[in-house]
């Protein structure tokens, strides 16, 4: 969306800058079919506003390893399909490799779709301590989330 940056800036303009640091914008791989200078500038501007940028569902769509160094992402969110195939030796190698690449590119790797303690332990063993999924917290309605005390 060409006007997204302006729209978001207007919405956040009355907000303390420190709150922007708690916002994470997840972008799916399909956005990167055509990387343009305008897209790169928009992403850079969003980061300058203090937002964290995450590439969501990495590894299953139109992603390319080249995107990891050409676009200003803070996080790489590895798709849950890798967790579903965690017992396959090649998948374990891919996950271990992604953990290494993320570290080398100074990006945070988040593995999505973790549902069991066994998966959690295996992923930690593969170098992926940051995880997301039903094991940690099921999705909540917004009203219930807002009613919870901050930790």
Describe each model-derived feature in a short phrase.
Residues 2, 22, 26-35, 51-151:
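EAL-family c-di-GMP phosphodiesterase catalytic domain
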Residues 7-15, 41-49, 93, 97:
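Catalytic-core regions built around general acid/base machinery
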Residues 8-20, 43, 69-72, 124:
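Acidic (Asp/Glu)-rich catalytic clusters
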């Amino acid at each position: 969306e060409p006007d997204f940056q302006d729209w978001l800036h207007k919405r956040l303009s009355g907000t303390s800058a420190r709150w922007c640091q708690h916002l994470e914008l997840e972008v799916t791989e399909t956005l990167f079919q055509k990387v343009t200078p305008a897209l790169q500038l928009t992403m850079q501007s969003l980061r300058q506003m203090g937002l964290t940028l995450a590439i969501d569902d990495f590894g299953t769509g139109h992603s390319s390893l080249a995107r990891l160094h050409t676009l200003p992402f803070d996080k790489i969110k590895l798709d849950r399909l890798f967790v579903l195939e965690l017992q396959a030796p090649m998948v374990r190698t891919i996950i271990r490799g992604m953990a290494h690449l993320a570290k080398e590119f100074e990006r945070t790797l988040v593995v999505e779709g973790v549902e069991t303690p066994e998966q959690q332990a295996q992923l930690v063993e593969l170098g992926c301590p940051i995880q997301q999924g039903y094991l940690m917290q099921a999705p909540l309605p917004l009203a219930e989330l807002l009613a919870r005390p901050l930790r």
